[in-house]
UniProtKB/Swiss-Prot annotation:
Gene: ndhB
SS bond partners: none
NCBIfam families for the chain: NDH_I_N, PRK02504.1
Protein name: NAD(P)H-quinone oxidoreductase subunit 2
EC number assigned by the record: 7.1.1.-
Length: 506
């Protein structure tokens, strides 16, 4: 009988998507041992099979989610499935745009792919973790792999500096999380997030508030919210560009998934407190991220500060707490996947051809490379929230949900900072479409001949076309995507209490 109960509670099928990613890690490491030539041929194929199988198993789980697995430490509900799908897709696109970059830098492809898949594994597990211990293991799996990726260009001192900064700040964030977790365990005697929430519901105290602050600090670090953002610009600038692309979407999505789960279960009785703190973080992130981005001269640093501002927009949906607000947050993260990785695809392609990251060097690019100009322009317009791009509809859903829940200040700040962001996005576009040849940068004047036949460029081309197409077809895709996000939220049991509370306030 005990063995029967254990088997029922284990529900190992919940992590089949993660199991495929794990097989991919093993496979890429094995081909890496066989030599660089073998790894270059087989590592991409193994990654595609691994991620494709993971996405397929997530799709099959959609109609039959596993509510509790591994003795209550993991939950494969529809919300977790949605976030894990976004992370898997972000990994797939990040790998597609990384093969040529990795080969040109002289780094081992099999080893690189294994570390990216390891980070993906940690991020996906974090989305469904429902126990303090499983959260920490997932968090550290993601973090350690991210540190390795940031410093992957061993010959580049900026990459080593980025890895060291990321390691130091990330270690501090992990220590803060453990300290907050120790308070929660001491107050409740349990490590299960839902059980802790039930135990502390009648125990409002200074210790509980301190635990909330510590946990929120960890969340803010993962999503790069102000004032826990200091690592972001330096790490983004120094890390390999494909790594930055993955961190900007995959790591951030995992952070938001963790935030929604722990705030809605463990701290559901402290919703006024955490919503106030989240409101402050959102306002600071939108304001500082978009204002400081105006002064950047590096494309990667500009996108780093842009990502800080984008995190603030997502927080509007979470603070609203309504079904529409949470659905809009999921939708916007899905939209952010395509428009941000589309922009990074163009940045990587330009960097491969010129070796430059300076915004000024994009001057006159339209004359030499219309494809990069068009793709980057569409993605930047979408990030700015201009119609009819996908980003416009994502922001509209977020702002409507916030306004309906009386989050007027957040919505007004969001609108103002969106206008600011449009200015620096359009400045880049204007620079690229300079008409007079003499106004083009020296880099563009000596632009190399475009050759898509080079090894590693066809996958990058596929990623670029896909991201730009999805971003540009926002008007058609926004409604079905929102319906999927709405289904994920409405069919996730632990969210219903916070939604009911938000509806009562409205």
């Amino acid at each position: 009988m005990p063995n029967e109960i254990f088997t029922i509670n284990l529900n190992a099928q919940a992590i089949i998507p993660e199991a495929f990613i794990l097989l991919g890690i093993v496979g890429t490491l094995l081909v890496d041992l066989a030599g660089e030539k073998t790894a270059s041929k087989w590592a991409p194929i193994i990654c595609y099979l691994s991620i494709g199988s993971s996405l397929l198993s997530l799709a099959l789980q959609w109609s039959n989610p596993v509510e509790s697995a591994f003795l209550g430490s993991f939950n494969s509900d529809n919300l977790a499935i949605s976030f894990r799908a976004i992370i898997s897709l972000s990994t797939l696109v990040s790998l597609l745009i990384s093969w040529r970059y990795t080969e040109q830098s002289g780094s081992p492809i099999g080893e690189f792919a294994a570390i990216v898949l390891s980070a993906t594994l940690g991020a996906m597990l974090l989305c469904g973790s429902t126990d303090l211990i499983s959260v920490f293991i997932s968090l550290e799996t993601l973090s350690v792999a991210s540190y390795l990726l940031s410093g992957y260009l061993k010959r580049d001192p900026r990459s080593s500096e980025a890895a060291l900064k990321y390691l130091l700040v990330g270690s501090a964030a992990a220590a803060v999380y453990l300290y907050g977790s120790s308070f929660l365990y001491g107050l409740s005697g349990s490590t299960n997030l839902a059980t802790i929430g039930l135990e502390i519901i009648n125990k409002p105290s200074f210790i509980t508030s301190l635990a909330l602050v510590f946990v929120l600090s960890t969340v803010a670090f993962k999503i790069a919210a102000v004032p826990f953002h200091q690592w972001t610009p330096d790490v983004y600038e120094g890390s390999p560009t494909p790594v930055v692309a993955f961190l900007s979407v995959g790591s951030k999505t995992a952070g938001f998934a963790f935030a929604i789960r722990i705030l809605s279960t463990t701290f559901s009785s402290f919703d006024e407190e955490w919503k106030l703190l989240f409101t402050i973080l959102a306002i600071l992130s939108m304001a500082l991220g978009n204002v400081v981005a105006l002064a950047q001269t590096s494309m990667k640093r500009m996108l780093a500060y842009s990502s800080i501002g984008q995190a603030g927009f997502v927080m509007i949906g979470i603070v609203s707490g309504t079904q529409d607000g949470l659905s809009a947050a999921v939708l916007y993260l899905a939209a952010y996947l395509f428009m941000n990785l589309g922009a990074f695809s163009c940045v990587i392609l330009f960097s491969l051809r010129t070796g430059s990251d300076r915004i000024l060097d994009y001057s006159g690019l339209y004359q030499k490379d219309p494809l990069i100009t068009l793709g980057l322009s569409l993605c930047l317009l979408s990030l700015g929230g201009l119609p009819p791009m996908l980003g416009f509809f994502g922001k509209i859903y977020l702002f409507f949900a916030g306004w309906a829940n009386h989050q007027y200040l957040l919505v007004i700040v969001g609108l103002v900072t969106s206008v600011i962001s449009i200015y620096y996005y359009i400045s880049v576009i204007k620079m690229m479409v300079v008409k007079e040849p003499q106004e083009a940068s020296e880099i563009v004047k000596s632009y190399p001949e475009i050759n898509w036949g080079i090894v590693g460029l066809p996958p990058l081309r596929v990623a670029l076309y896909t991201c730009v197409a999805v971003t540009a077809l926002g008007g058609i895709l926004s409604n079905p995507l929102f319906k999927l996000a709405n289904t994920a939220v409405s069919e996730t049991p632990f969210l219903q209490d916070i939604i009911a509370t938000a509806n009562n306030i409205s």
